[in-house]
């Protein structure tokens, strides 16, 4: 078709184009005709600046449409956009770009629709029709991006006098907006207001939805204490900075003051007091930081990295993080991607539940590590705690509360510091980082509270070489603590240590006093035989069990160990590793299961069923299956019946290709469902997919894969829904129902991935 391009001088150029031509192609055609380099061209249609990677049809540009050509002002510039998760996006813009243009660029980079974006600069929300220069936004300025949530609601604000104020708000209102509404109602200036929710001081720039404040939530209003004070900040170089602060200043405020004095950006600062990393949203008074206290300043390690988070549904999320990110930050990033509130998230790594205030580097989580995400069970319950004096305390808890939370509740009721509490259930000492549900503590269970004996003592540890190590311990130290002390002295990892006393191997969760180990007792240290190893078994409830095994153990042996720990009969256990169901008679080494591998435990559903498999020749095969059978199992049954090797089978249900490691129930395949069997063309191959951000993804495909299959693989890797993906090859947009071979896409071809504009054609 023909289109016209009108320049500012009034000249009109005629171009021959196709709807699938990209803006980049159009600029190349203009360069051919007029000699203007593409990087100096800006094309405008219907008041919108057109982006290089998009096509004419994306913008509904039809035959004889007229585009306007504007030459770029020299003075393109970079700006930064900071999200609530702390991630910073860099954008190439011009002073004349509208806020709408900027939101479109953010959509291209992050996939967030413009109508869900609110941009804030200098405390002001920016309007779509205005330009960056209208707001005096200059190069390297930082905008803040807040996500809009839909729908108004009422909340309550309770003052210290007991008065309750009702406010009309939206989830996307900032705390600053809320304070302005309070000023309208009560006349209290915003800078004298501190708002508290769930024990946390709320920050001006954050929104109600950031804090999970929902309809009819109650905030508490506290007036700021007047009264400044000095504190000191000590850097790693030994330099001490003096700051003027107020007890009500947030850690974020303090970091801003440090930036003013020292030029260190807040996102590179970590502040430590009393051994604890301080969180941005808390105040100095929350941490009991008083006049002339000294904080320690540590610079964040540079070096972003990717980690993976695996959910119980098998979905894997990729996150951009830094080693210095706290677990709380990671949960906020997961909330941004998946919408799961942080208080419903439990993150597990190496079998351990991760605590909010600790950092990734504290847990030695490195690039491409995989965390496991378990959702907290809803549903409060009462438990009882019995003290040695016979007194019984009643506590309101949730199954997902950690032992640490429970000790804090006991401290609230009884005033006993957590570090003096030991909680016992079913004869076992409970560990701080574990949850009530990990120990199967249910409603109306009774825990026993024992106070830790004060008073350290020395014990000796004798190694097989005859060397004797002296340790300072307390009777209430766990065996795990003792192993950590040995690691500090001797460098032997705890998982290679076995401690023996009175002929008995000591268990990690028990204490020295449980074994009657007294001062000057001698323990014997034996190193674990190589070949002995730990593996993890993850259940569908998210619980992780640790087993001591050897590579030569059979799957049958492993099931027996699980029965010992969990009481589940072996014939109800199915173990899955690397997407494969493990057979009883084989060994761990047969499956290349190594130390710290994670197996998945699925309980067998009682009740087989029949399904049908229809081939391209029209033949229908009947199979006996269970909902818990994997697709791999089904292919093996087809091989038994028809002799077709599994690697030549592709199974389709409801238009979707089924993956080997998933089960029939994952795909909601029920009795008498019909699957379709397609034979694979020989010849898997790799192709590349390049995104507009420049990232390249590698995919394993076959020439017979449909474009729909390819989009599903991209979703698995990148989390981008297929309906937001457009794939371009050789300048053409690829259609879902066609195959790679239809488009002559061969091994190592590169496709281009463009995100769909909402409402595009």
From Swiss-Prot:
One GO term (biological process): modification-dependent protein catabolic process
GO molecular function, one term: protein tag activity
SMART domains xrefs: UBQ
Residues modified as ADP-ribosylglycine: 76
Site positions for Essential for function: 68
InterPro entries in alphabetical order: Ubiquitin-like_dom (IPR000626), Ubiquitin-like_domsf (IPR029071), Ubiquitin_CS (IPR019954), Ubiquitin_dom (IPR019956), Ubiquitin_ubiquitin-like (IPR050158)
Family: Belongs to the ubiquitin family.
Protein name per the record: Polyubiquitin-C
């Amino acid at each position: 078709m023909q289109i016209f391009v009108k320049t500012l001088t009034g000249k009109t150029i005629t171009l021959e184009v196709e709807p699938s031509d990209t803006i980049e192609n159009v600029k190349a055609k203009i360069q051919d005709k007029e000699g203007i380099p593409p990087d100096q061209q800006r094309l405008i249609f219907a008041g919108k600046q057109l982006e290089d990677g998009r096509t004419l049809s994306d913008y509904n540009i039809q035959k004889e449409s007229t585009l306007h050509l504007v030459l770029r002002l020299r003075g393109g510039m970079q700006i930064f956009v900071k999200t609530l998760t702390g991630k910073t996006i860099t954008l190439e813009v011009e002073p004349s770009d509208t806020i709408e243009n900027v939101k479109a660029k953010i959509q291209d980079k992050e996939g967030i629709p413009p109508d869900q974006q609110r941009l804030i600069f200098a405390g002001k929300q920016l309007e779509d029709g205005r330009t960056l220069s209208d707001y005096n936004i200059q190069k390297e300025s930082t905008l803040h991006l807040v996500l809009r949530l839909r729908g108004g609601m009422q909340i309550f604000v309770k003052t210290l006098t007991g008065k309750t104020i009702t406010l009309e708000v939206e989830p996307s209102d900032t705390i600053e907006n809320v304070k302005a509404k309070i000023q309208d109602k009560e006349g209290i200036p915003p800078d004298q207001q501190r708002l508290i929710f769930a024990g946390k001081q709320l920050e001006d720039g954050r929104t109600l939805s950031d804090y999970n404040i929902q309809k009819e939530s109650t905030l508490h209003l506290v007036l700021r204490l007047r009264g400044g004070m000095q504190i000191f900040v000590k850097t790693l170089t030994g330099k001490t900075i003096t700051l003027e602060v107020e007890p009500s200043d947030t850690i974020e405020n303090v970091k801003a003051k440090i930036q003013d004095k020292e030029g260190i950006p807040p996102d590179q600062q970590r502040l430590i007091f009393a051994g604890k990393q301080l969180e941005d949203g808390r105040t100095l008074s929350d941490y009991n930081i008083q006049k002339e206290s000294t904080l320690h300043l540590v610079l964040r390690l540079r070096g972003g990295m990717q980690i993976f988070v695996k959910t119980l549904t098998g979905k894997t999320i990729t996150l951009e993080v830094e080693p210095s990110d706290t677990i709380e930050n990671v949960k906020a990033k997961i909330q941004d991607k998946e919408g799961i509130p942080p208080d419903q998230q439990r993150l597990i790594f190496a079998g351990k539940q991760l605590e909010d205030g600790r950092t990734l580097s504290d847990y030695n989580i490195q690039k491409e590590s995989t965390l496991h995400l378990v959702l907290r069970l809803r549903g409060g319950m009462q438990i009882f705690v019995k003290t040695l004096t016979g007194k019984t305390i009643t506590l309101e808890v949730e199954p997902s509360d950690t032992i640490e939370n429970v000790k804090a509740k006991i401290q609230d009721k009884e005033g006993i510091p957590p570090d003096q509490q030991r909680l016992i259930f079913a004869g076992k000492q409970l560990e701080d980082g574990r949850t009530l549900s990990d120990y199967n503590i249910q409603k109306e269970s009774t825990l026993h509270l024992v106070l830790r004996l004060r008073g350290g003592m020395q014990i000796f540890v004798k190694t097989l070489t005859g060397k004797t190590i002296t340790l300072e311990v307390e009777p209430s130290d766990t065996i795990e603590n003792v192993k950590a002390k040995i690691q500090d002295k001797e460098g032997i990892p705890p998982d290679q240590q076995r401690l023996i006393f009175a002929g008995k191997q000591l268990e990690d969760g028990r204490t020295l006093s449980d074994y009657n180990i007294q001062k000057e007792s001698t323990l014997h240290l034996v190193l674990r035989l190589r070949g002995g190893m730990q593996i993890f078994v993850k259940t569908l409830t998210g619980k992780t069990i640790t087993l001591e095994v050897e590579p030569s153990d059979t799957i049958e042996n492993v099931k027996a160990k699980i029965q010992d720990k969990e009481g589940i009969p072996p014939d109800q256990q199915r173990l899955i590793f690397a997407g494969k169901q493990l057979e009883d008679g084989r060994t761990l080494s047969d499956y290349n299961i190594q130390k710290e591998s994670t197996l998945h435990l699925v309980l067998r559903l009682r009740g087989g069923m029949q399904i049908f498999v229809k081939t391209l020749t029209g033949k229908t095969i009947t199979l006996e299956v269970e909902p818990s059978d994997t697709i791999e199992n089904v292919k093996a049954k087809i091989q038994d019946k028809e002799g077709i090797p599994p690697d030549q089978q592709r199974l389709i249900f409801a238009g979707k290709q089924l993956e080997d490691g998933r089960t029939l129930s994952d795909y909601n395949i029920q009795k008498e469902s019909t699957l379709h069997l397609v034979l694979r063309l020989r010849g898997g191959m790799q192709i590349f997919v390049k995104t507009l951000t420049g990232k390249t993804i590698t995919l394993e495909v076959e020439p017979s894969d449909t474009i729909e299959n390819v989009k599903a693989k991209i979703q698995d890797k990148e989390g981008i829904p297929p309906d937001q993906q457009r794939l371009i090859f050789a300048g053409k947009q690829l259609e879902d129902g066609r195959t790679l071979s239809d488009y002559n896409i061969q091994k190592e071809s590169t496709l281009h991935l463009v995100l769909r504009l909402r409402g595009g054609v």
